[in-house]
Structures are given as structure tokens and as C-alpha cells.
A protein has these predicted regions:
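A conserved acidic beta->alpha catalytic loop
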Residues: 42-52, 71
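Conserved nucleotide-sugar donor-binding catalytic segment
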Residues: 132-218
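Cell-envelope/extracellular polymer assembly enzymes that use nucleotide-activated donors
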Residues: 6-8, 38
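Short, well-formed alpha-helical segments that are part of the catalytic scaffolds
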Residues: 16-30
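Short beta-strand-to-loop acidic/aromatic patch adjacent to the donor-nucleotide binding site
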Residues: 89-98
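C-terminal subregions of glycosyltransferases and related glycan-biosynthesis enzymes
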Residues: 177-180, 184, 191-334
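Conserved donor NDP-sugar-binding/catalytic core segment of glycosyltransferases
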Residues: 100-135
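Glycine-rich, basic loop-to-helix element that forms the pyrophosphate-binding segment
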Residues: 69-87
């Protein structure tokens, strides 16, 4: 079977018309192996020129559909909605509107789909160049925070996976919910030898509240950031050792040196944009993660969680609630 027989693509977009158009140009370039795949453009109610560009491509290519949300549901909810569009092809790829593609490694992706690999990682900027660590699930999870890194295969997106994905929209990474469930059931991740997609940083607004009245977005969603969201998702791994290793990989960047995820991102953005503000952001986030969040994560996993879920604590809490309820009933009767 060919790529277009195996793969459906959903492109999520919101108010990035110039980058969106560049993305479409790459997808429909003469050397693009996915130019004949079914492509759904999932527009999160854009107010710029995005709808006009999408309609133009839909009129030029019969394999392109343009869907516009009735409301701006938020970027993460739009990701979950894109996951829900899985089918009828066995493989599903959700991509963004501002990234860069190199198609040289695509033959390996097609071979992996033909073999029936369940989960394929096509991004590798945060992975070791070679060796067994390249396909280590702990390392892959932090790479897969970058949405287009993931191609979902048969049986990965299920009813429960979709429920969990929607439940995790506030935690930034709803697309990791099916991955975590796959790993919980003993699944593996196939990592291709040469990455296909890299993040394209254009210096535009990448906040999770774009298009919303930011002061009215509920606190849980407004204040969640990368490390917290990642800790929430990896906290759902049944393998506690893998959970800890995954979080450690994000914080310390074990495969790319102590500089880690934030250091590499800072250098990348610094080189592309030349903004000194990124330095301050990197210093603040690295200090917070290394000195505060990771120790708290360890305390939670090794002490607080076992304590709060113990039978003794549960029974003590139940007795206390029974006593308080009894007092409340007496007051009502008197």
C-alpha cells in the first residue's frame, strides 16, 4: 500500500496565515510524499486570511477539506478534536501550521506503516543521534510533546484515549494521552533514523490563550505550563520508573547534555530570533524546574502519593467525615 492509502493528515491552524501558506506549499511541493494524502484543514475560527488560503487549496486539490470551528475552542482542544478525526485510513498524522519539513527520510516512514508499526516518531531534535537511547520511551515522550512528531497507528486512538485526551486539554499535551496508554499496555515506539519535521519558530504569539480574553480564562488552564503539563501526563504511566525517567529527561535533557530541553530551545530561538528575552525566560524556567518542580515531583511520588492513598489514611478520613456528618445531622434535628 502507498502513503496515500495508509495515511490521513489533519492540519490545525489559527491566525497564522503566512506560516500556514508556507506549510501548505511544503505539503504540496513536487517532492512531497504526502501531496496526495487526504488532508483536513481544521481551522480554529481564524480571523485573518487563513480561511481564504484554505479555500483556495481546497478548490485546487480534491483531497483537501476545510473545516472551520464555530468557536475558537483553544489550541489544545483543537488538537483533541483533530485526534477525533481519526479514520478511515489506518494511520493518522496531526500537524501544525508553522513547522519545517524534510522529506528525505520518508521512505522509512512508509515502510514502518506497511509493517504495521503502532506508533511512529518522525521528529528527533531532542533525541540521541543513534544508539538504543534514541528509541527509549522516556526520551521519546519529551520529543513527542512536539505534536507533529507523532504518527498514530491502528488501535492507538480509542474511545478511552479520546476521553483522556479531552481531559488533558488544560495540561497542554492531549496528544500524549494515546501515547501514554499505548506504553501502559506494553507498546513500543518506532523512531525513524532521520527526522521529518522540525519546529518552525517565527517569533509569533504561541501562547495557549491566543484569541481568548486571557484574564477570563480559568486559572488552571491559564497557569499550566510545559513542565506541569508533562508531569501530569507522565504521572499516568503505570511504570513508575518510566514516569520518573521521562520527567527527568525533560528537566535534565539526558540525551542532549545538562543544558537540556530548555537550553537547546533557547539556543534555537536565540539563533532564529536574536532576542535577549529568551535568555531570561530560559534562566527562570530552568531554575524553577531543576530547583523546585523536580524535587516536588519526587516528594509526591515517593512520599505524598503513597501516604494519601494508604488504607489507614482513607479509614481515618472516613471516620472524620462520618463524625462531621453526624454533628451536622444533630444540629439540623435540634
Amino acid at each position: 500500500m502507498t502513503t496515500e492509502q495508509l495515511l490521513d493528515i489533519v492540519l490545525i491552524t489559527f491566525n497564522r496565515a503566512p506560516q500556514f501558506e508556507k506549510t501548505l506549499e511544503m505539503l504540496f511541493a513536487p517532492d512531497s510524499p504526502v501531496r496526495n494524502c487526504a488532508l483536513t484543514i481544521l481551522d480554529n475560527k481564524s480571523t485573518d486570511e487563513t480561511p481564504q488560503i484554505a479555500e483556495r487549496y481546497a478548490s485546487l486539490y480534491p483531497n483537501v477539506k476545510h473545516h472551520v470551528n464555530n468557536f475558537n475552542v483553544g489550541g489544545n482542544a483543537n488538537i483533541a478534536k483533530a485526534l477525533e478525526m481519526y479514520g478511515p485510513k489506518p494511520y493518522h498524522w496531526v500537524i501544525c501550521d508553522d513547522d519545517v519539513y524534510n522529506w528525505e527520510g520518508w521512505p522509512e516512514v512508509e515502510e514502518a506503516m506497511q509493517r504495521g508499526e503502532k506508533l511512529i516518531c518522525v521528529g528527533d531534535r531532542h533525541l540521541a543521534k543513534n544508539g538504543p537511547k534514541r528509541s527509549d520511551p522516556a526520551e521519546c515522550l519529551q520529543q513527542m510533546t512536539f505534536l507533529p512528531s507523532i504518527i498514530y497507528g491502528p488501535g492507538i486512538i480509542t474511545d478511552t484515549a479520546m476521553r483522556n485526551a479531552y481531559d488533558c486539554t488544560f495540561a497542554l499535551f492531549p496528544h500524549l494521552a494515546p501515547v501514554v496508554m499505548h506504553l501502559n499496555h506494553g507498546g513500543s515506539i518506532y523512531v525513524i533514523k532521520q527526522g521529518i519535521v522540525l519546529p518552525g519558530c517565527y517569533g509569533n504569539d504561541a501562547s495557549i490563550t491566543r484569541g481568548d480574553v486571557k484574564t477570563e480564562v480559568f486559572t488552571r488552564s491559564r497557569t499550566t505550563y510545559l513542565a506541569v503539563g508533562f508531569a501530569i501526563l507522565t504521572g499516568e504511566l503505570w511504570d513508575r520508573k518510566l514516569s520518573k525517567r521521562a520527567f527527568k529527561a525533560l528537566v535534565y535533557g539526558s540525551q542532549i547534555g545538562w543544558f537540556g530541553f530548555y537550553g537547546q530551545t533557547f539556543l534555537y530561538l536565540r539563533g532564529r530570533e536574536g532576542s535577549a528575552n529568551f535568555h531570561a525566560i530560559w534562566l527562570q524556567s530552568t531554575f524553577l524546574m531543576r530547583c523546585v518542580l523536580y524535587p516536588l515531583h519526587l516528594i509526591q511520588n515517593s512520599f505524598l502519593y503513597p501516604l494519601l492513598t494508604s488504607k489507614r489514611i482513607y479509614n481515618a478520613g472516613k471516620r472524620l467525615m462520618d463524625r462531621l456528618n453526624g454533628r451536622a445531622r444533630k444540629k439540623l434535628q435540634s
